[in-house]
C-alpha cells in the first residue's frame, strides 16, 4: 500500500488529509539505526479505502524511532513471512509489494525525486531500480504531450 520495507511495516501510521490517505513511516535503511520519519502517499486510494487501511490493527507497533529493535522485528517478520507464504502465492514475497509500489510510481508518472522520498531511498537508487518502468512511462508521457500539441494546432 505504501511501498514500505518489511522492516518498516510496524511503524506505518496511516492518516487522511484533504481527502487523501497518507502514512508516516519510520525509514529503516539496511544496517542503519532509524531516525527519520517520512510521509508516503497510498498510490491506490480505492484499495486503501476498501482495505480500511486507516483502521488496521497490528500485533506490534513502533511509535518512536527509539522503539526500533532489529532482533525483535526480525523474529516478528519471520513469523509474518511464513504466514504470508501460507496465505498467498508462495512465489510472492512481501518485498515484492514494495517493488510493485516502486513500479507503480513510474507508471503513474510520479517524478523520481518524489517517488524516492515516498520509498525512503535516494533518487539514484530509485532511478536505477525502476529505470525500465520510467523509460516506458516517459515515452508514453511524451507521446501523449505530442498528441495534445498536434490536436491544438
Q: Where are the language model's segments positioned?
A:
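Short helix-to-turn junction characteristic of helix-turn-helix DNA-binding domains
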Residues: 12, 105-106
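Intrinsically disordered, low-complexity basic tails/linkers immediately adjacent to helix-turn-helix/homeobox/MYB/SANT
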Residues: 144-153
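Short, polar N-cap/turn motifs at the start of nucleic acid-interacting alpha helices
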Residues: 15-21, 110-129
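Active-site/catalytic core of tyrosine-dependent DNA strand-transfer enzymes
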Residues: 40-91, 95-96, 101
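Conserved tyrosine-mediated DNA breakage-rejoining catalytic core shared by Y-recombinases
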Residues: 4-7, 11-49
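Active-site-proximal segment of tyrosine recombinases
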Residues: 8-9, 92-93, 102, 110-120
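Catalytic-site neighborhood detector that most strongly recognizes the C-terminal catalytic loop/helix
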Residues: 27-32, 119-144
Amino acid at each position: 500500500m505504501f511501498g514500505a520495507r518489511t522492516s518498516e511495516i510496524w511503524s506505518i501510521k496511516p492518516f487522511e488529509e484533504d481527502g487523501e490517505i497518507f502514512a508516516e513511516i519510520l525509514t529503516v535503511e539496511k544496517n542503519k539505526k532509524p531516525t527519520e520519519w517520512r510521509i508516503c502517499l497510498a498510490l491506490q486510494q480505492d484499495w486503501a479505502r476498501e482495505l480500511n487501511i486507516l483502521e488496521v490493527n497490528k500485533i506490534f507497533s513502533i511509535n518512536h524511532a527509539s522503539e526500533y529493535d532489529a532482533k525483535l522485528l526480525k523474529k516478528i517478520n519471520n513469523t509474518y513471512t511464513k504466514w504470508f507464504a501460507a496465505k498467498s502465492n508462495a512465489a510472492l514475497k512481501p518485498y515484492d509489494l514494495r517493488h510493485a509500489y516502486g513500479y507503480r510510481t513510474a507508471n503513474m508518472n510520479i517524478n523520481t525525486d518524489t517517488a524516492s522520498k515516498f520509498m525512503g531511498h535516494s533518487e539514484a537508487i530509485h532511478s536505477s531500480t525502476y529505470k525500465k518502468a520510467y523509460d516506458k512511462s516517459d515515452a508514453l508521457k511524451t507521446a501523449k504531450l505530442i498528441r495534445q500539441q498536434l490536436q491544438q494546432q
